[in-house]
Design a protein with these regions (language model features):
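C-terminal peripheral helix-coil segments that are non-catalytic and often amphipathic
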Residues: 88-91, 127-139, 158, 164-210
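Hydrophobic alpha-helical connector segments
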Residues: 55, 69-95, 151-155, 179, ...
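Amphipathic alpha-helical packing segments from all-alpha helical-bundle domains
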Residues: 62-66, 113-140, 149-153, 180
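Generic hydrophobic, amphipathic alpha-helix propensity
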Residues: 6-14, 31, 56-60, 64, ...
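Helix-turn-helix
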Residues: 6-9, 17-51, 55
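Amphipathic alpha-helical segments used for helix-helix packing
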Residues: 93-114, 131, 164, 168
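Hydrophobic/aromatic residues within well-ordered alpha-helical segments
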Residues: 49, 56, 60, 64, ...
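Short, hydrophobic secondary-structure boundary micro-motifs
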Residues: 101-105, 146, 174, 198-199
Length: 210
C-alpha cells in the first residue's frame, strides 16, 4: 500500500476515534491496532499524538474551507455570495456533526502548535476569499468597510454559535432548517454597520456646518 493511502487510512481512523473518544482518551496505539499497522508505519506517518490530532484538525478545517470557498466564488452577486457562505457553513456542520464538534472544541496548545503551519497555508486562500467577499459587499453598499475579523464575527457569528450548540446536543433544530433565518441575520448585522457609518458622516457634516 502506498504511503499516501496509508496516511489516508490513518487519518480516517484517527478522525473516527478522536470524535468518539475525545483527545484525552485518544492514543496512537489505538489507531495502530485498529488498522493492523506496525509501530514503524505509524511513526513514519505521524511521529506523535499531537501531530496526528493536528492533522485531523487541519484536514477537517481544509474540507470546510473548500466547501465555503466553492459556495462563495460560485455566486454571481455580493448578496448571493453571502447567502451561499451561510448555507455552506450550516450544511457542512450538519453533514459532519462529530468532526465539527471536534473542530469547535478546545484543543491542547501542543496540538494547535503542530497545526499552525499547515493551517496557515489553507487559511491564506480562505482569508483571501473572505476579504474579496467583504470588499464586494462593501462596494455593493451592504456593509461598511470593516476589518475581516469584525466582518466575520458579524457575518458568521450567529451561525457558528448555533452550530456549536447543535453539535453538543444543546440545540435540536438541524442547522439547514435555519439557513434563511441566519442568512437574514448576517445581512442585517452587516447592513447595520453601513447605516451607522452613514449616520456618523451626516452628524459630522452637521457639526462642520454648525
Amino acid at each position: 500500500m502506498s504511503t499516501t493511502a496509508t496516511r489516508a487510512r490513518i487519518l480516517a481512523e484517527a478522525t473516527r476515534q478522536l470524535t468518539e473518544l475525545g483527545y484525552a482518551a485518544f492514543t496512537i496505539a489505538g489507531v495502530r491496532d485498529a488498522l493492523g499497522l506496525s509501530s514503524g508505519s505509524m511513526f513514519h506517518a505521524f511521529a506523535s499524538k499531537p501531530a496526528l490530532a493536528a492533522a485531523v484538525y487541519v484536514e477537517g478545517m481544509a474540507d470546510y474551507q473548500r466547501a465555503a470557498i466553492t459556495a462563495i466564488t460560485s455566486a454571481d452577486s455580493a448578496d448571493a455570495a453571502l447567502r451561499a457562505f451561510i448555507a455552506a457553513h450550516l450544511a457542512w456542520i450538519e453533514d459532519h456533526r462529530a468532526l465539527a464538534r471536534y473542530l469547535f472544541g478546545s484543543l491542547p496548545d501542543e496540538v494547535m502548535a503542530e497545526a499552525a503551519r499547515p493551517l496557515a497555508e489553507h487559511n491564506a486562500q480562505f482569508f483571501g476569499v473572505l476579504d474579496a467577499l467583504y470588499l464586494r459587499l462593501s462596494r455593493a453598499g451592504l456593509m461598511a468597510a470593516l476589518d475581516r475579523s469584525v466582518a466575520q464575527a458579524l457575518c458568521i457569528g450567529p451561525a457558528q454559535e448555533y452550530g456549536r450548540q447543535w453539535t453538543r446536543g444543546l440545540a435540536s433544530i438541524p442547522p439547514r432548517k435555519l439557513t434563511r433565518a441566519l442568512q437574514a441575520a448576517a445581512l442585517a448585522a452587516l447592513a447595520s454597520t453601513s447605516s451607522s457609518t452613514a449616520r456618523t458622516r451626516r452628524n459630522t457634516r452637521r457639526t462642520e456646518r454648525d
